[in-house]
């Protein structure tokens, strides 16, 4: 179906109607960018017409109006003021829209007829580099995806940071995991069918002609862009799918940016085996930087991020989403953090970094020649800090810190250039003048003196004219439209001297010009124009000079970013009482007094620490206990401790010894602070299936309440089968939380079979009168009660409903046994069972009596037990 814009243009082309010259100009520009919103410059506004106007009015909540008519019909129109357009542009980009900026070319006042207009810039969600359009603590990525019969090729670029990377994956699941990790703002895909469901409806997806995703074409494009003869230096010579994606991305960038991209100097191949794998579900369940409800507060990143600079914050986020398996790299990071703590140098670095600014993105704008005056002053101030940073680092005995010290480089000449060339506090825009410092250029200083002396000349002229004319209220002034003038009120206008020439008539005054004032105006305005022109020339010279230093400056910015992250790790370790983890070669996961970093940070009460001990002969813990008892928190805290250790951070534990880990996989459908009943049984089984197919003996797996989304017996059977598969086939490290107490018998089976791979632990609660107190301490062995009814009462269920539930529980316990036993035998269910919903004793009263521990019962519990026993007789 054609858009209204296209129909209107077609009418014009067919000759059925005739459009105004302005609308013809609009349609000509719009025809080149039919899928983009066109910001059409008209004086002090960017106007949008037809469908663009309707869409912008809806998205931006601005007024939709009409601008006369063209082609025999009213023209829908909406607009935003030029002085405030960046705010509107940022909102559109955040919504996944792309915008073409069509500017007026030349001076409208000098144009004969219709002023010329031209699209000078295209802004898309993945290609923005303007500071006002970017989230300073999050990468803005453009990604392209190609596919072949063997899998998918990915290429992504951070244009604002100057990074360009590629990867190849072998499945749609792996593709989804990468997209979840990188969160691209814009995604380029071939316009073909049969793409995975998770791409449908995603914001920012751009369908492009399939021929753009060709491996041979991509290779030629990359060779031409980087001016190379082969791609072997980048490690992608044998990666045709990734090469195809990279070529498609590069073509899109060149098409939209309309300029060279000198800051993209290389392309890197990510190696999947170097990082711990986490699928999309795991990232969601662990709430690394966003909670499952979409909130960004109370996340791991929120607790961990103590970086001072925006570029440090972005690097930390990248590290958090790609924990490394490279032991030597991690040991160097841990050692660097410890060295900073021991020397007390982290505080000194962080204090120095507070004046640093976002050098990484500033250097990109320098490379693209879009840097603003205050980018120069920020870069100047940042480079001026380098001697202090080098002094702090010089005595520190840490291999990584000394490597970063060397990567800072020597930039004294560049710093001196900026100190001498840039004003202390430059204006926001070059066109305002005053960017170049006084004393840097003699010609500019002379032109400025002419402008400066003009103020005194005008004061003297005003006094002389008042005296000679006898008009005490006479004023000398200036405006941009009419230039300099002598203003006399209407009541005094008849006293104007004969040599005054009228320049402008106002409601209450007349404005005049004299030969002397005209001569002065020509001289001063010429000086100001020449001054601005000279400043622009000098400004371009600064960009040229900095352009030759970009590589070294980018390395320096990268080193400063990492120092910021490491200093932040040191600050967090001391403030939160975290310890240095130990990375072992042997398979193990031993954590002493571990805590959940986020829960501990937000809770007012002290956090109950817990231990974890997994190794070759003890790979699975079956975790039982009451709802709200802390099972999910315990599981996730151990996963987060492992993750923190693998980004180079200290960890919330008194000691952590961690063997090789290749994956963290989770299935958490409901629980403490998780999605409230939104998981479906199909999602549960799909995520479980992924884990069973991908977990290895070096994987850490969290399974929370498997089987609760279906019937009791189906759920129990599935939970039993999944646990057995993980323990005996995958043989991974597994934390298996369940409300099926029958599964605790798996540990007994394991011991009986001579393989002690499964153990039971539980979290308990204690009743004090009407109150239920959760202990949050992990203890050996299975739980002996579920406290389900007590938790229901705590949740606010009416007392009548709870009472009815108690009666129903007794009935089910009395009647529910035989069919249950028949269905599940012989399984873990043959072992002694908890007295509860799924019990199947041959003698219910006898079994219930054996389950009682008189020393543990409160008077109220004893009375309830007596009533239950009586009902079973």
From Swiss-Prot:
One of its GO terms (cellular component) is cytosol. Pfam families: MutS_I, MutS_II, MutS_III, MutS_IV, MutS_V. GO terms for molecular function: ATP binding; ATP-dependent DNA damage sensor activity; damaged DNA binding; mismatched DNA binding. ATP binds at residues 625-632. Disulfide bonds: none annotated. One of its GO terms (biological process) is mismatch repair. It comes from the Bacteria. Keywords: ATP-binding, DNA damage, DNA repair, DNA-binding, Nucleotide-binding. InterPro entries: DNA_mismatch_repair_MutS (IPR005748), DNA_mismatch_repair_MutS-lik_N (IPR007695), DNA_mismatch_repair_MutS/MSH (IPR017261), DNA_mismatch_repair_MutS_C (IPR000432), DNA_mismatch_repair_MutS_clamp (IPR007861), DNA_mismatch_repair_MutS_core (IPR007696), DNA_mismatch_repair_MutS_N (IPR016151), DNA_mismatch_repair_MutS_sf (IPR036187). HAMAP family: MutS (MF_00096). This protein is involved in the repair of mismatches in DNA. It is possible that it carries out the mismatch recognition step. This protein has a weak ATPase activity. Belongs to the DNA mismatch repair MutS family. This is DNA mismatch repair protein MutS.
């Amino acid at each position: 179906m054609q858009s209204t814009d296209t129909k209107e243009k077609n009418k014009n082309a067919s000759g059925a109607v005739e459009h105004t010259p302005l609308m013809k100009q609009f349609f000509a520009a719009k025809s080149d960018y039919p899928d983009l919103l066109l910001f059409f410059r008209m004086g002090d506004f960017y106007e949008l017409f037809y469908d663009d106007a309707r869409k912008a009015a809806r998205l931006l909540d601005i007024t939709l109006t009409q601008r006369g008519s063209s082609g025999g019909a009213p023209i829908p129109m909406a607009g935003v003021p030029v002085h405030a357009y960046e705010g509107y542009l940022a909102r559109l980009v955040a919504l996944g829209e792309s915008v073409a900026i069509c500017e007026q070319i030349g001076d409208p006042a000098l144009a004969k007829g219709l002023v010329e207009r031209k699209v000078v810039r295209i802004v898309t969600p993945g290609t923005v580099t303007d500071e006002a359009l970017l989230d300073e603590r999050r990468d803005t990525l453009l990604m392209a995806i190609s596919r072949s019969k063997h899998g998918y090729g990915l290429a992504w670029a951070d244009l604002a940071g100057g990074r360009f990377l590629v990867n190849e994956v072998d499945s749609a699941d792996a593709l989804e995991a990468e997209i979840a990790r990188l969160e691209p703002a814009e995604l380029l895909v071939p316009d073909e069918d049969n793409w995975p469901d998770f791409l449908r409806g995603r914001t920012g997806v751009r369908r492009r002609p399939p021929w753009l995703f060709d491996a041979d074409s991509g290779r030629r494009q990359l060779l031409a862009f980087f001016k190379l003869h082969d791609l072997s230096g980048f490690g992608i010579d044998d990666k045709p799918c990734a090469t195809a994606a990279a070529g498609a991305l590069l073509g899109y960038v060149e098409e939209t940016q309309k300029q060279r991209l000198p800051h993209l100097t290389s392309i890197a191949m990510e190696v999947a085996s170097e990082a711990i794998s986490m699928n999309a579900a795991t990232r969601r369940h662990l709430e690394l930087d966003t909670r499952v409800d979409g909130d960004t507060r109370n996340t791991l990143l929120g607790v961990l991020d103590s970086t001072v600079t925006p570029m440090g914050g972005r690097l930390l986020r990248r590290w958090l989403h790609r924990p490394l398996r490279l032991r030597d790299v991690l040991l160097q990071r841990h050692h660097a953090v410890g060295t900073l703590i021991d020397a007390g140098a982290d505080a000194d670095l962080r204090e120095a970094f507070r004046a640093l600014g976002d050098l990484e993105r500033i250097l990109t704008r320098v490379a693209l020649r879009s840097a603003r005056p205050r980018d120069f002053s920020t870069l100047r101030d940042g480079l001026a800090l380098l001697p202090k940073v080098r002094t702090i680092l010089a005595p520190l005995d840490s291999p990584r810190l000394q490597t970063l010290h060397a990567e800072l480089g020597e930039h004294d000449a560049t710093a001196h250039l900026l100190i001498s060339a840039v004003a202390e506090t430059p204006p926001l825009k070059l066109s305002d003048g005053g960017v170049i410092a006084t004393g840097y250029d003699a010609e500019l200083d002379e032109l400025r003196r002419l402008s400066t002396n003009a103020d005194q000349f005008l004061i003297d002229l005003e006094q002389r004219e008042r005296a000679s004319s006898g008009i005490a209220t006479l004023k000398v002034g200036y405006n941009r439209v009419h230039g300099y003038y002598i203003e006399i009120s209407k009541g005094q206008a008849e006293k104007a001297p004969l040599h005054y020439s009228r320049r402008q008539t106002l409601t209450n005054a007349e404005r005049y010009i004299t030969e002397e004032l005209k001569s002065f105006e020509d001289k001063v305005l010429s000086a100001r124009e020449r001054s601005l022109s000279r400043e622009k020339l000098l400004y371009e010279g600064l960009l040229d000079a900095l352009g030759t230093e970009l590589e070294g400056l980018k390395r320096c910015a990268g080193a400063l970013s990492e120092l910021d992250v490491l200093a932040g790790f040191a600050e967090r370790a001391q403030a939160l009482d975290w310890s240095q983890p130990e990375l072992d070669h042997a398979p193990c996961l031993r954590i002493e007094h571990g805590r959940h970093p986020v829960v501990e940070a937000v809770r007012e009460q002290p956090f109950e620490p817990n231990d974890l001990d997994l190794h070759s002969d003890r790979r699975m813990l079956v975790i039982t206990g009451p709802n709200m008892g802390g099972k999910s928190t315990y599981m996730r805290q151990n996963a987060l401790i492992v993750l923190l250790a693998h980004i180079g951070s200290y960890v919330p534990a008194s000691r952590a010894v961690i063997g090789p880990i290749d994956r963290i996989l989770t299935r958490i459908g409901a629980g403490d602070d998780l999605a409230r009943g939104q998981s479906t049984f199909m999602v549960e089984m799909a995520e479980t299936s992924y884990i069973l197919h991908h977990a290895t003996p070096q994987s850490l797996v969290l399974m929370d309440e498997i089987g609760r989304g279906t019937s009791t017996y189906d759920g129990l059977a599935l939970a039993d089968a999944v646990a057995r598969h993980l323990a005996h086939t995958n043989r991974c490290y597994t934390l298996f939380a369940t409300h099926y107490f029958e599964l605790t018998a798996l540990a007994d089976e394991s011991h009986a079979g001579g393989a002690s791979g499964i153990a039971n632990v539980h979290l308990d609660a204690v009743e004090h009168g009407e109150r239920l107190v959760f202990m949050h301490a992990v203890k050996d062995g299975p739980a002996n009660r579920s406290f389900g009814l007590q938790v229901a009462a705590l949740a606010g269920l009416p007392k009548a409903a709870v009472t009815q539930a108690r009666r129903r529980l007794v009935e089910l316990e009395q009647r529910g046994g035989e069919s249950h036993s028949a269905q599940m035998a012989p399984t873990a269910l043959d072992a002694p069972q908890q007295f509860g919903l799924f019990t199947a004793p041959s003698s219910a009263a006898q079994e219930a009596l054996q389950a009682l521990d008189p020393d543990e019962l409160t008077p109220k519990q004893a009375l309830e037990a007596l009533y239950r026993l009586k009902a079973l007789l």
